C-alpha cells in the first residue's frame, strides 16, 4: 500500500461477513482483499472500501 491508497479500517471486519456463506472474513493486507475460506473467494478492497460482490471476487487457488 502506498501513501495515495486509503487504508482499510480493520474494525469493519467485525461487521462484515462473506455474502455467500455468512462466515467471517480474513484481511489480507498485502493483496488488499478480504478472504472467505469457506467460499474460497477473495473480495477486493478498492480505495479502502471492500467490494463484496461475488462477480468481483477472485477464486482462491
Curated annotation (Swiss-Prot):
Belongs to the UPF0434 family. This is UPF0434 protein TM1040_0056. It comes from the Bacteria. SUPFAM superfamilies: Trm112p-like (SSF158997). One of its GO terms (cellular component) is cytosol.
Amino acid at each position: 500500500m502506498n501513501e495515495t491508497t486509503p487504508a482499510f479500517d480493520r474494525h469493519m471486519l467485525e461487521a462484515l461477513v462473506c455474502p455467500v456463506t455468512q462466515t467471517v472474513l480474513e484481511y489480507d493486507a498485502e493483496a488488499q482483499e478480504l478472504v472467505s475460506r469457506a467460499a474460497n473467494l477473495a473480495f477486493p478492497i478498492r480505495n479502502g472500501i471492500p467490494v463484496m460482490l461475488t462477480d468481483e471476487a477472485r477464486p482462491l487457488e
